[in-house]
A protein has these predicted regions:
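A structural feature that tracks compact, well-ordered secondary-structure segments
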Residues: 59, 71, 117-119, 195-198, ...
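Bacterial N-terminal signal peptides
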Residues: 10-21
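Bacterial N-terminal signal peptides that target proteins for export
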Residues: 2-12
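Core segments of cupin and vicinal oxygen chelate
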Residues: 50, 60-112, 152-176, 183, ...
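N-terminal signal peptide c-region/cleavage motif recognized by signal peptidases
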Residues: 23-25
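Intrinsic disorder/low-complexity detector
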Residues: 30-54, 60, 82-92, 122-124, ...
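Vicinal oxygen chelate
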Residues: 29-48, 55-63, 104-113, 115, 129-149, 151-214, 218-226, ...
Length: 359
């Protein structure tokens, strides 16, 4: 009898251990840990870095949608859907109902979704942004994997003193969707970070964007800021990794508006995501950064795309309506790299940068 009880006890213990190990293995690895507090309660959620590895969407606010979209179509963005007049009945601004209507166009460059928005009625965040800063990309959106992740990240940022600016929700054939803009722009270099909870964003893009070269993939995002170190410190304090490096940049072969350039800047690089972020603090001008700052203040400056033959692409894009505005090069172990800004800023407040990097 004792041997029977002992055997059963071993089997029960083994089963319990197996269930515990299985539960541990099945736990999602991207979910931040929740440490129990002294009173046995669950601690507040932490920052989930996996969410911010990829930019899913940019919200690009403009005053003349048709003019801007037609221009970028000429440059090669053809994966475009004209959504028409869109209602946002559930929109709120800083906790107050702010129902809006806006003209909207959705486009894709690679796996990046672009929402061009021209506010018509309501939408205080969009209309105030236009009045204060002009046209431009105002928001970068990051997709969560579940409604719980969405709520947890909002709780986390709230615990760090970051409030919600805009909230919206909707229902479509894919399910219930939500978006929340966080109040990061004032200290974060004009970057409004948004969380998106929408079932269709949980899936990979079904087809690549059918755009013309070189507008087939965005290879970096860039902002003009007043103090790159303060921006770095702000995001580090929120729990993001510090910038990979901050360099005093004095490029070779500098050209600005067809004349020899003397511009210098601090460049901060954040390479923690799948697409690098560049933060530019202007030191010596004139240059396109000074132009941008005078017109828009701090904020999103350019989208970068890679090219294989710089001179050929400059000819191509000039013919499409985007001549060069600034040009510079640098040395690499495999030859000279080169970066050329195109004069697209008058059409939507965003500059397009061509990058040739032989590495």
């Amino acid at each position: 009898m004792r041997r029977g009880h002992s055997s059963r006890l071993v089997l029960i213990c083994t089963a319990i251990l197996g269930v515990a190990l299985l539960a541990k293995t099945a736990a999602p690895q991207s979910t931040p840990l929740r440490a129990p507090t002294k009173g046995g309660e669950t601690a507040a959620p932490g920052l989930n870095p996996a969410i911010y590895h990829h930019v899913a969407q940019v919200i690009w606010v403009v005053s003349d949608l048709d003019r801007v979209v037609e221009y970028w179509q000429r440059l090669g963005v053809h994966n475009v859907h004209r959504d028409g007049m869109v209602s946002f009945p559930n929109l709120t601004y800083r906790g107050t109902p702010d129902p809006a209507t806006a003209k909207q166009v959705t486009a894709n460059i690679g796996d990046l979704e672009i929402k061009w928005i021209q506010p018509v009625h309501g939408g205080k965040f969009w209309s105030d942004g236009l009045r204060q800063h002009g046209d431009g990309i105002r928001v970068l959106g990051y997709a969560v994997n579940s409604p719980r992740e969405f709520d947890d990240q909002i709780k986390y940022f709230s615990s760090r003193g970051v409030n919600l600016v805009v909230q919206d929700s909707w229902q479509d054939p894919t399910g219930r969707g939500r978006i929340a803009y966080l109040d990061t722009a004032a200290q974060g270099g004009g970057h409004t970070l948004a969380l998106i909870d929408q079932p269709q964003t949980h899936l990979p893009a079904a087809v690549p964007a059918a755009n013309e070269y070189p507008l087939t993939k965005i290879t970096h995002f860039a902002w003009v800021v007043n103090d790159v170190r303060k921006v770095d410190a702000y995001y580090t304090d929120l729990g993001f990794p510090p910038f990979s490096r901050i360099d005093h940049n004095v490029s070779l072969d500098r050209v600005y508006r067809g004349q020899p350039g003397i511009y210098e800047m601090w460049l901060g690089w954040d390479r923690t995501g799948d697409t690098p972020f560049e933060w530019v603090q202007q030191i010596v001008g004139p240059d396109v950064y000074v132009e941008y700052g005078k017109k828009h203040g701090e904020g999103f400056h350019h989208l970068g795309v890679n090219v294989s033959d710089m001179d050929e692409v400059i000819k191509l894009m000039s013919a499409r309506g985007a001549p060069p505005s600034q040009d510079a090069s640098w040395k690499t172990s495999k030859g000279k790299g080169r970066a050329v800004y195109l004069d697209s800023e008058p059409y939507g407040g965003v500059t397009l940068e061509l990058i040739y990097d032989p590495r």
